[in-house]
């Protein structure tokens, strides 16, 4: 009986134990079931993050490459714009330069009104300059030429030193005109530097001009047997008494070498009296007594 009771008790307890096992197994499986869906979700979020970061980096690199290409393409256009701007500036400077006057026939055909007489009130008022007072210097000729081309052109009075005049011109001229003037001065300086060498060459003294007496003496040697050699004073004029040593004849002459008539003879003469009687301007033997008294 006791065995039967114990067996029945075991059979009654068996379903209870099975239920407990099922509960334990279910409790163990519930956390695992809660964990299984979380693992793939975390993996998907990491993959999406990596993908988004790589796409962002790719877009940044592509943007930088596009910007560099755009700047490279625009560089050529900027160079063309710079060249065009420089050409326009040069053309503007060229238009500012003074132009030569047109022929009268062309001016009549193009603008006939310019040939009509203008009233005096319409002319610009300014300091009038006397265009007839010109010297023989280079600037005088240039001034005369410019006045003929444009009689109404007014030139500032430049009476200071050279640096002061340049400063005055820089302060009074317009910017474009001063730039043109600076360019001209630059080319003029290059021309002067190329024309003159840096080494100062010693300048030779100009040859001394010989008088008639000195020239005759230079052609005759000091020892001159049988030839006439005139005598000159310190100024190069002929001495009043000239002698031919080989034949012994002497005569009187004027300072220019003209012989006084009727003075040739042997021996020495007093040429001062002969020169007073003769007219030194002619040298042809005409005496002052023959000319008569000089009218007062």
UniProtKB/Swiss-Prot annotation:
Cytoplasmic topological domain residue ranges: 1-46
Residue spans, topological domain Extracellular: 73-296
Post-translational modifications reported in the UniProt record: O-glycosylated with core 1 or possibly core 8 glycans. Contains chondroitin sulfate.
InterPro entries xref list: CD74_antigen, MHC-II_Gamma/Thyroglobulin, MHC_II-assoc_invar/CLIP_MHC-bd, MHC_II-assoc_invar_chain, MHC_II-assoc_invariant_trimer, MHCII_invariant_trimer_sf, Thyroglobulin_1, Thyroglobulin_1_sf
Region (Required for interaction with CTSL): 225-226
Residue ranges crossing the lipid bilayer per the database entry: 47-72
Disulfide bonds: 213-232, 243-250, 252-271
Gene Ontology terms, MF aspect: amyloid-beta binding; CD4 receptor binding; cytokine binding; cytokine receptor activity; identical protein binding; macrophage migration inhibitory factor binding; MHC class II protein binding; MHC class II protein binding, via antigen binding groove
Tissue occurrence: Detected in urine (at protein level).
Subcellular location, record wording: Cell membrane; Endoplasmic reticulum membrane; Golgi apparatus, trans-Golgi network; Endosome
All residue ranges annotated as the Thyroglobulin type-1 domain in the record: 210-271
Membrane topology summary: Single-pass type II membrane protein
CDD domains to which the protein is assigned, alphabetical: TY (cd00191)
Annotated site, Breakpoint for translocation to form a CD74-ROS1 fusion protein, chain positions: 208-209
Domain notes: Antiviral activity requires delivery of the thyroglobulin domain to the endosomal membrane.
Disease: A chromosomal aberration involving CD74 is found in a non-small cell lung tumor. Results in the formation of a CD74-ROS1 chimeric protein.
Protein name, entry field: HLA class II histocompatibility antigen gamma chain
Gene that this sequence comes from: CD74
């Amino acid at each position: 009986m006791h065995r039967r009771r114990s067996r029945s008790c075991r059979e009654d307890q068996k379903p209870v134990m099975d239920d407990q096992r099922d509960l334990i197994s279910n409790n163990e499986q519930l956390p695992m079931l809660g964990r299984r869906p979380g693992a793939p979700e975390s993996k998907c979020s990491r993959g999406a993050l990596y993908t988004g970061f790589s796409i962002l980096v790719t877009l940044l690199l592509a943007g930088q490459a596009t910007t560099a290409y755009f700047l490279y393409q625009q560089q050529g256009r900027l160079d063309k714009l710079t060249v065009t701007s420089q050409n326009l500036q040069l053309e503007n400077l060229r238009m500012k330069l003074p132009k030569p006057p047109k022929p009268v026939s062309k001016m009549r055909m193009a603008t006939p009104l310019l040939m009509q007489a203008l009233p005096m009130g319409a002319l610009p008022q300014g300091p009038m300059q006397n265009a007839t007072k010109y010297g023989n210097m280079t600037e005088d000729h240039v001034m005369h030429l410019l006045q003929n081309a444009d009689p109404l052109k007014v030139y500032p009075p430049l009476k200071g030193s050279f640096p002061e005049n340049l400063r005055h011109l820089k302060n009074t001229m317009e910017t474009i005109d001063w730039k043109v003037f600076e360019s001209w001065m630059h080319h003029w300086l290059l021309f002067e530097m190329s024309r003159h060498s840096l080494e100062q060459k010693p300048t030779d003294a100009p040859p001394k001009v010989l008088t008639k007496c000195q020239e005759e003496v230079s052609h005759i040697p000091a020892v001159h047997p049988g030839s006439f050699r005139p005598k000159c004073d310190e100024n190069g004029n002929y001495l009043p008494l000239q002698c031919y040593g080989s034949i012994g004849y002497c005569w009187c002459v004027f300072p220019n070498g003209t012989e006084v008539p009727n003075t040739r003879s042997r021996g020495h003469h007093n040429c001062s009296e002969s020169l007073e009687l003769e007219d030194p301007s002619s040298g042809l033997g005409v005496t002052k007594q023959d000319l008569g008294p000089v009218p007062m």
